[in-house]
């Protein structure tokens, strides 16, 4: 029986060849291929800079850290997401503020968002679930309305002057809203390049950010480099330059840089990505047609306002309980079709 895996990586001989060349080059950690991929993604998203890291989780956490968020602060996110959206808030010592979804929606309840913003609120992490951009215009409307409560703690917060939008766009690389790419809509954006994602580097992620008046992009990029490489003032590539061995440790930070082996996969994936997105759209169209007469609710991936990356095809079985859903998943598995549940709401977990 033919089986259909849930989300296998789409790897061709071209990716394998590029990885082999990286291995033969003698440079396998952060280096020229990582820098090349960063430039490709920045051009694609329409941003000045991109920092490639080893995961979206690292990206989410470093976004909060460059903003100086920590103990005594509050960060808002959705209750309907993967744990990383919230766990990074705990990592930095801030308080997690969860908002439930609106009725009949997978997005957070924006009416509740307005009510939970306090003087301690420093950021919101909205989630582009399944590759569909969330309602950014509504989010900006609300945080601008409540900006009088905002008390900045560092120069970036002060320059922005309101609650900062740090999008969890782990699913949404390649998505657009009102003609603008995800990655250049929120103040800061995190992408995932994990093995199950549309665009993969096996493991990996990236941070992007919009231009901020009064903030130097090169300085901000360097801050990410420090945070992702033990606070070391120069990466390994920079230290190979003539007479440039000496470096400084600027802080006791972290180790979450992307390697050139990972970037090698991404460089080829990037060339193939338009076709990969086109293929996903064709499959989603088939699903939409096949389920049109069924008693289910599905997300709309393509509208006049947005274009999804098509990462997940979520189906809500109407008027059915979890026992029916679980039996349905089993029946699909018996037919060789893998499915999954995205997501168990965070408050339903043991911790």
Describe each PLM feature range.
Residues 63-119, 123-125, 332:
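Conserved PLP-anchoring active-site segment centered on the Schiff-base-forming lysine
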């Amino acid at each position: 029986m033919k089986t259909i895996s849930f989300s296998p990586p789409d790897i061709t001989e071209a990716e394998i060849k590029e990885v082999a060349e990286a291995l033969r080059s003698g440079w396998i950690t952060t280096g020229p291929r990582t820098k090349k991929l960063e430039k490709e993604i920045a051009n694609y998203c329409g941003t000045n800079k991109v920092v490639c890291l080893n995961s979206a989780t690292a990206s989410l956490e470093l976004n909060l850290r460059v903003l100086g968020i920590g103990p005594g602060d509050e960060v808002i996110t959705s209750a309907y997401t993967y744990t990383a959206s919230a766990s990074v808030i705990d990592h930095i010592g801030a308080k997690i503020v969860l908002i439930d979804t609106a009725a009949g929606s997978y997005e957070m309840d924006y009416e509740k968002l307005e009510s939970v913003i306090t003087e301690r609120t420093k950021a919101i992490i909205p989630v582009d679930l399944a590759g569909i951009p969330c309602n950014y215009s509504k989010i900006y409307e609300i945080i601008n309305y409540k900006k009088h409560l905002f008390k900045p703690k560092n120069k970036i917060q002060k320059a922005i002057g309101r609650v900062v939008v740090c999008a969890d766009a782990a699913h949404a690389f390649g998505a657009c809203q009102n003609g603008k790419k995800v990655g250049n809509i929120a103040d800061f954006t995190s992408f995932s390049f994990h093995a199950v994602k549309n665009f993969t580097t096996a493991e990996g992620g990236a941070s992007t950010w919009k231009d901020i008046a009064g903030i130097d992009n090169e300085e901000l990029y360097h801050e990410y480099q420090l945070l992702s490489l033990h606070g070391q003032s120069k990466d390994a590539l920079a230290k190979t330059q003539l007479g440039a061995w000496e470096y400084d440790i600027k802080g006791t930070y972290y180790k979450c840089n992307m390697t050139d082996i990972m970037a090698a996969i991404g460089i080829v994936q990037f060339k193939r990505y338009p076709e990969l997105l086109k293929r996903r759209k064709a499959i989603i169209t088939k699903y939409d047609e096949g389920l049109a007469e069924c008693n289910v609710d599905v997300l709309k991936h393509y509208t006049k306002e947005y274009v999804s990356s098509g990462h997940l095809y979520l189906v809500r079985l109407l008027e059915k309980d979890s026992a029916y859903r679980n039996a349905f998943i089993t029946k699909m598995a018996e037919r060789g079709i893998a499915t999954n549940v995205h997501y168990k709401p965070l408050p339903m977990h043991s911790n």
